[in-house]
Swiss-Prot record:
GO terms for biological process: cellular response to retinoic acid; central nervous system neuron differentiation; exploration behavior; multicellular organism growth; negative regulation of mitotic cell cycle; positive regulation of neuron differentiation; social behavior. The keyword tRNA-binding does not apply. GO terms for cellular component: cytoplasm; dendrite; extracellular region; mitochondrion; neuronal cell body. The lineage of its organism: Eukaryota, Metazoa, Chordata, Craniata, Vertebrata. This is BMP/retinoic acid-inducible neural-specific protein 3.
């Protein structure tokens, strides 16, 4: 803080106590400028220009001390002594006594010279540059005693690392310096002696002692004759007042405007604020007053230095022992994709810690660059030429994974290229191909290799389940045709099949054996009781080399004249034989399933053809068809337009004759297909005793296809029926344990295949 000596002398001559003290920013700026000339090459000189009250902050003072000394850290311990409390009686006298201010004649003369309407430049030259912008209201004068230690942490850490076990007792650490600084006011002489010894022995620290005011000159008889300093501790605050309160009313507003222009615009323009934005309205001689070119240039240089530091951090990471050791441990006998490298990365704790250290350093660097960029934009928003801002892109873990791949596969002949996992190729410098190494085979699931060939790492050695090795590559195994095991389709087209079903053509009739203990064909019977009948093929006895598909069912039912009976049919289908409990119920007229079609025949009796057409959409395997016939009474409703059915007939008066019923014929429409049970048994045998390498997988693939195609023909429902187990159980005569073993083997094999999804089935056959 600088005092105007001439003004101070005049005021002391007027009053016993200080009545008016003015702070002169002008003299303070000259002092800083003098220092700045001595350090023209310092990178922080751009901060030391005249920018107003900012330079009186404690943070800025600490920064200047630290940067001027060339050290990275500053430790200071001090104590203050408040001797005198100083008040400005000039303002108090004006406020309470109403007397004129006892100001210096030169100050009055400068005010009169300004006139009634001075320009901002005149106010700046005659008042601000001579007397400053503020004067002192109250403060505390006293003394201070302080010890300042400037420390270069890098030199200190290198010195500590270089010390061996025999010199550890004399090595200097930050903890040692903290202890010495804390003991300064307890034992000053020995503390200074030890610190000066460390300063001489090492260039890592510099010690400065400051003693000002009466505290440092306590041996004087008259302390009043000793020059004092302003005490700026929190309990002794300095109170300032704007100089405009001492000026006439007509000058106050213009003075404030001139002071702001002087501080913010360096007297090169007029300071203007509008809509929460402030700027300088530049004068004709200073068109770039809003554009601090020196500051902008310094910030651009800082960004360049940050870029260089960014490159150095990345280079240090690549050259670190952790990175080299991680690269050395990577397997070379198969290709490493980014997922595999990331998995190995997470397993290496040392490498992870080193990468986290790099990330933290980069984050701090990036935040520092962001602050500079934001300030750069703020300073240059009114410049005619915008600054050049170039920041390196932050390198994520994905970049380093690709970088590691480049070191592995694009680092031949002293050239390092860039690897692309998508194209599986390298991009070499100057569009050359000499940096590309031989890529090992890819190990993984599906079509990737199970292992690489030991004699040639670029080719597959073995393949995964469901794939076969072909010329060094793994190709999907395609199951051989299952037509020689079991047939599924007929030669008839859909339209032909539909036409033959409509005509109930005998060419698609499957001849089955009719069996019933309750009735006979072409014979009248009393329908009061439920009748059971079945059509069976007895394939195991007569047609062991065939399986059969049902496409439709037709019955011709006749009733006596004027009968009110209505037949009700329930159909169960047994796919491959076995007991009746292993049959499934046909959901007629449910969930879009076909319904019975009734056609009246041109006969004297009431005869109808009842036809159920399944077609290709609802066709399924059948060995036996169980038909249950019940009857119900049909009568007109109360409105005459609707029918009401009564059942069961067992509870109707036995003496009441409801008529009789007979079934002339029953036909099953469908077709028979080739079936070779011995060949399928031989296929199953290969699961335990494969003929050659790969024949077991081929057999499993064929059995899977047979299983899926058989189960696909199950009736509609939320879950498919397990028809394949019925085929094994009744047509191949396998035991229950063998069926379970085969199904388990198929499920396990299917789970290993790529892009497959198994499905749940409902058990039908025990």
């Amino acid at each position: 803080m600088i005092w105007r000596s001439r003004a101070g002398a005049e005021l002391f001559s007027l009053m016993a106590l200080w009545e008016w003290i003015a702070l002169s920013l002008h003299c303070w700026v000259l002092a800083v400028a003098a220092v700045s000339d001595q350090h023209a090459t310092s990178p922080f000189d751009w901060l030391l220009s005249d920018k107003g009250p900012f330079h009186r902050s404690q943070e800025y003072t600490d920064f200047v001390d630290r940067s001027r000394q060339g050290f990275s850290t500053r430790y200071k311990i001090y104590r203050e002594f408040g001797r005198w409390k100083v008040n400005n009686l000039a303002v108090e006298r004006r406020n309470f006594l109403g007397s004129p201010l006892p100001l210096a004649p030169e100050f009055f003369r400068n005010i009169r010279l300004l006139g009634r309407r001075p320009t901002l430049q005149q106010i700046t030259e005659n008042l601000i540059k001579k007397y400053g912008t503020h004067f002192l209201l109250s403060a505390t004068l006293g003394g201070e005693e302080s010890l300042t230690i400037f420390v270069d942490k890098r030199k200190l850490s290198k010195r500590a690392e270089g010390s061996d076990s025999t010199t550890n007792s004399s090595s200097v650490t930050l903890e040692t310096l903290h202890q010495l600084a804390a003991s300064y006011f307890i034992d000053r002489d020995s503390t200074l002696r030890r610190l000066h010894h460390i300063q001489i022995a090492s260039t890592a620290i510099k010690v400065t002692e400051t003693r000002t005011g009466p505290l440092g000159c306590s041996n004087y008889d008259n302390l009043d004759s000793v020059s004092s300093v302003l005490v700026q501790s929190p309990e002794n605050k300095i109170q300032l007042q704007g100089l405009q309160v001492l000026l006439p009313d007509y000058l106050q507003e213009r003075f404030v405007q001139a002071a702001l222009s002087y501080i913010a615009c360096n007297s090169e323009g007029e300071f203007i604020c509008k809509e929460n934005d402030c700027w300088c309205h530049c004068g004709p001689k200073f068109p770039e007053c809003n554009c601090p070119s020196m500051d902008i240039q310094a910030m651009e240089e800082n960004l360049l230095r940050i870029t260089e530091t960014w490159k150095a951090y990345n280079s240090d990471f690549e050259e670190s022992d952790e990175f080299k050791l991680f690269m050395k441990r990577l397997p070379m006998n198969y290709f490493l994709n980014t997922s595999t490298i990331m998995h190995l990365w997470t397993m290496d704790s040392n490498f992870q810690r080193r990468y986290e250290q790099l990330e933290n350093s980069m984050k701090q660097l990036f935040l520092k660059a962001q602050k500079i960029v934001h300030k750069l934009f703020s300073l240059s928003k009114r410049c005619h030429k915008q600054p050049l801002i170039s920041l390196p892109r932050q390198r994520t873990s994905t970049y380093w994974l690709t970088r590691i791949q480049s070191f592995l596969y694009c680092n031949e002949n002293g050239l390092l290229g860039s690897f692309s996992e998508e194209t599986h190729s390298c991009t070499c410098p100057n569009d050359q191909v000499v940096c590309t190494a031989f890529l090992p085979c890819t190990v993984g699931d599906a079509s990737a290799c199970l292992t690489c060939a030991p004699d040639n790492r670029t080719r597959c050695g073995t393949c995964n389940t469901g794939y076969m090795l072909s010329q060094g590559l793994c190709k999907p195994e395609v199951a051989e045709s299952t037509d020689h095991y079991i047939g599924f389709e007929t030669d008839l087209q859909d339209l032909e099949m539909k036409y033959l079903l409509q005509k109930t053509d005998r060419r698609i009739e499957v001849h089955a054996i009719f069996i019933s203990n309750d009735m006979r064909l072409n014979s009248w019977f009393d329908p009061s009781w439920r009748k059971r009948m079945l059509l069976t093929l007895k394939s195991n006895k007569y047609k062991s080399s065939l399986v059969h598909m049902i496409l439709g069912l037709s019955l011709q039912i006749c009733l006596t004249k004027n009968s009110t009976l209505e037949p009700v049919l329930a159909v169960y289908v047994n796919p491959f034989g076995g007991s009746h409990s292993e049959s499934w119920f046909m959901p007629v007229n449910e969930n879009s399933f076909p319904d019975w079609e009734r056609t009246k025949l041109d006969l004297p009796l009431q005869c109808y053809n009842w036809t159920l057409t399944l077609g290709n959409k609802w066709k399924t395997f059948f060995e036996t068809v169980h038909i249950y016939l019940r009857s119900r009474i049909k009568s007109n409703g109360p409105n005459g337009n609707e029918s009401i059915y009564y059942e069961p007939l067992e509870f109707i008066d036995p003496s009441r004759n409801l008529g009789y019923m007979k079934i002339n014929n029953i036909q099953v429409f469908g077709y028979s297909m080739h079936f070779d049970p011995e060949a399928i048994r031989d296929l199953i045998l290969q699961l335990d005793y494969p003929y050659t390498q790969g024949s077991q997988d081929s057999a499993l693939l064929q059995l899977l296809e047979i299983r899926d195609r058989v189960n696909k023909l199950s009736p509609p429902g939320q879950r498919r029926l397990d028809l394949f187990s019925c085929l094994l159980r009744h047509r191949l005569k396998l035991s229950t344990s063998e069926v379970v073993r085969i199904q388990s083997a198929l499920q396990a094999f299917n789970a290993k295949l790529p892009n497959t999804m198994d499905y749940d089935t409902t058990k039908l056959c025990s």
